[in-house]
Every structure is written in structure tokens, then in C-alpha cells.
């Protein structure tokens, strides 16, 4: 009986993603192919799912969009692609998704998503207010003879 339930759940995963091709596409992109109920979609196209049969911490997940702000994000997904209102629900800070109870507007929340620029030339580097302990040596300029 237990084997039948395991096979049934495996078949539900394959059919839940639109067949074998859709299952493999989701599996290779996210390294997991869960099936759950669609809770909502944000303004960027990310889809949020929930399955209460999974244990806590793995019962809510996101399937990222393939294009965001004109950038192809099929293989280049980033955790900062989740808006703040969905972050609350995704990390179980609140039980109500933003589709049923919208998050209050805050002035520090961006209206349009900005990608994480850590490790790129656009990253923020604060100005150093301390003096250098070691000064680099600059040789005196002498004309060539």
C-alpha cells in the first residue's frame, strides 16, 4: 500500500509540471520538483507555492521568472529577486500571503527591483575615513640619460 502511495505521488509530480519535459525543466533549474498549490504571483512573474505536507521550512517555495527587468534570469537566479511582501510570507514571518493581506507601504522599499550587485563594479564601497598606516613608495622621477 505504501509503494502505491509513493508511485502515486511521483506520478503527481510529473503530471503537475505538464509532463516529463516540464518536470525535467523544473528539476534541472531548481534541483527540486515539488508539487503544491499556487498561492500567488508577484509583479515580476515569480510564482509562489505552498504544500503543507512538507515539513516546516520547506513547505513554501518560489519558482523564479525567466526574465526580469529586461534581463534573462533563466539560469542566473538570485534570492534578492523576491519582493519584500512575498519575503515575509516565504520565510513564515506571516501566515497571510500578500494576495489576501497586502504589506503596508514603507518609504525604504523600492518600487522597482534592483539586482544584487555584490562582486560587480557597481557595488557600494564606503569611503575610508582612516589614514593609511603604510604609504606606497613612489620613486623620484629622473630624466633618462
Curated annotation (Swiss-Prot):
PTM sites of type N-acetylmethionine: 1
Listed Pfam families: NDUFA12
UniProt xrefs under InterPro entries: NDUFA12
Keywords per UniProt: Acetylation, Electron transport, Membrane, Mitochondrion, Mitochondrion inner membrane, Respiratory chain, Transport
GO cellular component, one term: mitochondrial inner membrane
Compartmental location: Mitochondrion inner membrane
Mitochondrion keyword on record: yes
Membrane topology category: Peripheral membrane protein
GO biological process: response to oxidative stress
Family: Belongs to the complex I NDUFA12 subunit family.
Physiological role: Accessory subunit of the mitochondrial membrane respiratory chain NADH dehydrogenase (Complex I), that is believed not to be involved in catalysis. Complex I functions in the transfer of electrons from NADH to the respiratory chain. The immediate electron acceptor for the enzyme is believed to be ubiquinone.
Complex and partners: Complex I is composed of 45 different subunits.
Name this protein carries in UniProt: NADH dehydrogenase [ubiquinone] 1 alpha subcomplex subunit 12
Amino acid at each position: 500500500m505504501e509503494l502505491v502511495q509513493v508511485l502515486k505521488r511521483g506520478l503527481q509530480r510529473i503530471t503537475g509540471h505538464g509532463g516529463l519535459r516540464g518536470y525535467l525543466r523544473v528539476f534541472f533549474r531548481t534541483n527540486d520538483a515539488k508539487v503544491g498549490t499556487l498561492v500567488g504571483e508577484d509583479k515580476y512573474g515569480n510564482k509562489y507555492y505552498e504544500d503543507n505536507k512538507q515539513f516546516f521550512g520547506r513547505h513554501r517555495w518560489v519558482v523564479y521568472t525567466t526574465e526580469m527587468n529586461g534581463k534573462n534570469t533563466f539560469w542566473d537566479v538570485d534570492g534578492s529577486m523576491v519582493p519584500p511582501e512575498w519575503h515575509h510570507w516565504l520565510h513564515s514571518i506571516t501566515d497571510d500571503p500578500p494576495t489576501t493581506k497586502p504589506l503596508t507601504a514603507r518609504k525604504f522599499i523600492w518600487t522597482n527591483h534592483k539586482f544584487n550587485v555584490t562582486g560587480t563594479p557597481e557595488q557600494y564601497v564606503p569611503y575610508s575615513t582612516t589614514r593609511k598606516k603604510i604609504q606606497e613608495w613612489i620613486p623620484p622621477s629622473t630624466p633618462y640619460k
